[in-house]
């Protein structure tokens, strides 16, 4: 028996066991490329260039009269709100009786270098909003995530003709005076914005993603694979959920140079939005013009859009009905993490129900 124990704990056996565990890690990571995402059926009801306006299919008639239009970040795949079964904010909103629409900006490339926020807001988004409102026969709820939230905010400030009934912002940076490490790294004296946008007609998705990962270099780098190796030993570990999330994180979308120049230069570097100096198509974007009910969602441990950046919106709008909820988690985790279905989704759902 003693010899058997020695053989069992021999360096060779331990080495083989470690090799097998890390082989599982490699196979899991490689399999992420084929992870099934975006499971909720949907139809394209409008398109322009690369952008698509989707309406998610319902199996029963809507019981809420106010539809929800989701506005996504320009640099991420839109399926994050419909990641997989059990991790789909879209599916939750459908279950609550809403008609749900989503504006997917698509995959930009070099031919889109001149696209800027003026065009995206006043041509793409304006048409999408009017189409949803026309189909619904009334105003809608705008739900914006991250950069998509900033775009939705600008639109709401510019268009006060009654199209927007409610505005919901998820981890949306608004005031960049204290934007955390990312704000420091994008200061004009250290960040080569003009060089970057002149070299790249569409800034590769990997570049903004590198900035995000550098905010937490160990957890976002080798640390994620060390944690994966540990989790793969757990019988109840959701491998398919991990693969879907890993796929999304690593499928960045190129950022048109015109948009990127505005986003970094006018928002991060010069903080024009809260100063009332931002102009879209020759019109000033004044946050004080926003009077609709506003729900601002902040992630407690968000390093991409820290709380000073996101909470500021409440002090600039004229909405009498405005609220903020702080959800435990990070920039992405609050939307699709384990606690999303029991924390964020019900809170947003109840807020919308009371304003339907």
Each model region followed by its residue ranges:
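Alpha/beta-hydrolase-fold enzymes
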Residues: 1-14, 134, 138, 152-258
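Short, surface-exposed "cap/lid" segments of acyl-processing enzymes
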Residues: 31, 36-109
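Alpha/beta-hydrolase active-site loop
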Residues: 114-134
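Gly/Ala-rich beta-loop-alpha elbow adjacent to hydrolase catalytic centers
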Residues: 143-152
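Acidic catalytic loop of the alpha/beta-hydrolase fold
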Residues: 271, 300-305
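Short beta-strand/loop motif that positions the catalytic acidic residue
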Residues: 290, 296-298, 302
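Short alpha-helix in the alpha/beta-hydrolase fold that links the catalytic acid
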Residues: 292, 306-316
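Catalytic histidine-centered segment of alpha/beta-hydrolase-like enzymes
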Residues: 324, 328-343
């Amino acid at each position: 028996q003693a010899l058997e124990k020695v053989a069992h704990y021999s360096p060779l056996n331990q080495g083989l066991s470690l090799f097998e565990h890390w082989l599982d890690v490699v196979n899991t990571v490689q399999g992420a490329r084929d992870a099934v995402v975006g499971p909720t059926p949907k139809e394209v009801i409008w398109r322009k260039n690369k952008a698509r306006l989707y309406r998610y299919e319902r199996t029963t008639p809507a019981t809420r009269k106010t539809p929800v239009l989701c506005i996504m970040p320009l640099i991420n795949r839109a399926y994050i709100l419909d990641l997989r079964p059990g991790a789909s904010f879209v599916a939750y909103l459908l279950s609550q009786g809403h008609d749900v629409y989503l504006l997917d900006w698509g995959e930009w490339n070099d031919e889109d270098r001149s696209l800027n926020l003026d065009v995206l807001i006043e041509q793409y988004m304006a048409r999408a909003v009017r189409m949803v409102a026309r189909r619904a026969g009334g105003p809608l709820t705008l739900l914006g995530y991250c950069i998509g939230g900033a775009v939705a905010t600008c639109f709401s400030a510019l268009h006060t003709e009654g199209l927007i009934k409610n505005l919901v912002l998820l981890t949306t940076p608004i005031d960049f005076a204290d934007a955390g490490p990312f704000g420091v790294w994008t200061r004009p004296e250290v960040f080569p914005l003009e060089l970057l946008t002149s070299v790249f007609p569409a800034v590769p998705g990997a570049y903004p993603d590198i900035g995000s990962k550098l905010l937490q270099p160990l957890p976002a780098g080798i640390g994620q694979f060390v944690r994966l190796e540990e989790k793969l030993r757990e019988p109840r570990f959701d491998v398919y959920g991990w693969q879907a999330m890993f796929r999304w994180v690593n499928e960045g979308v190129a950022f048109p140079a015109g948009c990127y120049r505005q986003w970094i230069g006018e928002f991060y570097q010069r903080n024009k939005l809260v100063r009332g100096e931002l102009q879209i198509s020759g019109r000033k974007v004044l946050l004080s013009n926003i009077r609709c009910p506003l729900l601002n969602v902040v992630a407690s441990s968000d390093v991409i859009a820290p709380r000073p950046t996101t909470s500021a919106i409440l002090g600039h709008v004229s909405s009498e009905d405005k609220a903020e909820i702080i959800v435990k988690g990070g920039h992405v985790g609050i939307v699709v993490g384990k606690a999303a279905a029991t924390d964020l989704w019900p809170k947003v759902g109840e807020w919308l129900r009371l304003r339907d």
